[in-house]
A protein has these predicted regions:
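N-terminal signal peptide c-region/cleavage motif recognized by signal peptidases
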Residues: 12-14
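N-terminal alpha-helical modules
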Residues: 16-104
Length: 104
């Protein structure tokens, strides 16, 4: 009975997810995808602080379309998502540099 009670209590206790221990740029496809998405999240957050929501939405749509077209030959491969996310990040960072230049 105690074992059942313990099992019941463990099943309702909150579990805290830990961030994976990955050293970027990563050693395999999964790790590289993770690293690429982390970099994209950083550049995307920086753009959110610089652009109006409407401009950001337009920018994101354009970069997604351009990057998807640029890497279309790899669409069936496991590396495709990483390449598209990395492309989005690179374009974001170029725009951030341009915006920085305008503010000086």
């Amino acid at each position: 009975m105690k074992g059942l009670l313990l099992l019941l209590l463990l099943s309702v206790m909150p579990v805290q997810a830990e961030q994976p221990d990955i050293q970027c740029p990563g050693q395999n496809t999964v790790e590289r995808r993770f690293c690429a998405s982390q970099k994209w999240e950083e550049s995307n957050q920086a753009l959110k602080e610089q652009l109006e929501p409407r401009s950001l939405k337009t920018w994101m749509k354009a970069t997604q379309e351009v990057c998807a077209a640029a890497y279309a030959p790899y669409r069936q491969g496991t590396i495709y998502p990483q390449m598209v996310v990395s492309c989005d990040d690179r374009l974001n960072r170029v725009l951030l540099e341009e915006l920085k230049g305008l503010g000086e």
